[in-house]
Amino acid sequence: MESFFNSLINIPSDFIWKYLFYILIGLGLFFTIRFGFIQFRYFIEMFRIVGEKPEGNKGVSSMQAFFISAASRVGTGNLTGVALAIATGGPGAVFWMWVVAAVGMASSFVESTLAQLYKVRDGEDFRGGPAYYIQKGLGARWLGIVFAILITVSFGLIFNAVQTNTIAGALDGAFHVNKIVVAIVLAVLTAFIIFGGLKRVVAVSQLIVPVMAGIYILIALFVVITNITAFPGVIATIVKNALGFEQVVGGGIGGIIVIGAQRGLFSNEAGMGSAPNAAATAHVSHPAKQGFIQTLGVFFDTFIICTSTAFIILLYSVTPKGDGIQVTQAALNHHIGGWAPTFIAVAMFLFAFSSVVGNYYYGETNIEFIKTSKTWLNIYRIAVIAMVVYGSLSGFQIVWDMADLFMGIMALINLIVIALLSNVAYKVYKDYAKQRKQGLDPVFKAKNIPGLKNAETWEDEKQEA
């Protein structure tokens, strides 16, 4: 029966990904050129913006919005996904993860700027995302509802099953904890957080992400430094394998590219339409500011966290064997001793659980787009908890396959939409660039963009940043 479901999922997934990679890279390159290599020219600017506070210290700050999206990004894709990519696609998959991220940073700027532009008020806070800019920018509420359903099901349900599946595997491998016990504990913790709303999501995200990411990066640096003589050889292997000069595992260069793209997109979410839901929550003076913040998020996720995992694994073996997290655990055990599996299990628990929390919020804001209803929201919360339990107990491969399918559908819709709305995002960017050239801290007003409609949040003379 499971093989039947695997086939049912893999056939449409393979078809979508066959073409999605070219759209992903093509649009990323288009945005990169159209916006003048914005992800490189404004790289330092991103760090300036990330520390800004909202006026009067009300609402969600730029950094808090960054942590919400980072909570979703920094999870299984960074540890399990990278290991899976290397095991199935070889070292070259890492190179294509870098390529997808580099061009995807421009896509992330566009989608997150649009999310800020078309956000709506929610009490003292804001909410928004692709569903909102599809309705307001394209006038297609029906498509917004389709996207809202997709992201609610995929992130709140499917992707959370992926996260808890990895948690259960890591805890079983390190401590031999019964998966039923893991499922119960995760269900209780998840319920406590998600019934607390946005404030509790923010609190958990900004606590877990910086601490665990910092520790993980330091360990990766230690591994690289202590294996510095082997490091140039690893880089050479990555490039040679990526370009087809050196085959390490079975399959051609096309397979390596697709595997790298899939795992990279699952981790950094550039162009997928997920991070814009976090970007919309921030109180900022200009929509482009969150575009830059989420662009930085893609860099942080792929070039820092994912790359750390890749080097940890490849300095251990260029042909690792095993499923996901077990590969990373074995590599760390080789580098830093017997306590490594314990560390990686705890790190995986915290990273993945923060992703569960961030993923939940993406679903919540889209439930509210479809219909503001406490009943439907509570039904969704119960469904999230049920999928947390399911993921803890289910098989490994079918969960990843379901994630790949839903991720592909979401990305396809969002990429088409942001391509159609890219001219609007470009005008917003030019407004920001003009003010920065004048030495100003940019403040956006909708009237500065002729013909701009449905950006009600930015129509006031004085913006509440």
UniProtKB/Swiss-Prot annotation:
Q: How does it sit in the membrane?
A: Multi-pass membrane protein
Q: Which GO terms describe its cellular component?
A: plasma membrane
Q: What InterPro entries does this protein's entry cite?
A: Na/Ala_symport (IPR001463)
Q: Where are the transmembrane segments?
A: 20-40, 82-102, 142-162, 177-197, 208-228, 241-261, 296-316, 336-356, 382-402, 405-425
UniProt keyword annotation of Transmembrane helix present: yes
Per the entry, induction is: Negatively regulated by TnrA under nitrogen-limited conditions.
Keywords for the protein's UniProt record, in alphabetical order: Amino-acid transport, Cell membrane, Ion transport, Membrane, Sodium, Sodium transport, Symport, Transmembrane, Transmembrane helix, Transport
Q: Which Pfam families match?
A: Na_Ala_symp (PF01235)
Question: GO terms for molecular function, please?
Answer: amino acid:sodium symporter activity
- Where is it located? Cell membrane
Among NCBIfam families, the record links this protein to: agcS (TIGR00835)
The family assignment reads: Belongs to the alanine or glycine:cation symporter (AGCS) (TC 2.A.25) family.
Q: What is this protein called?
A: Amino-acid carrier protein AlsT
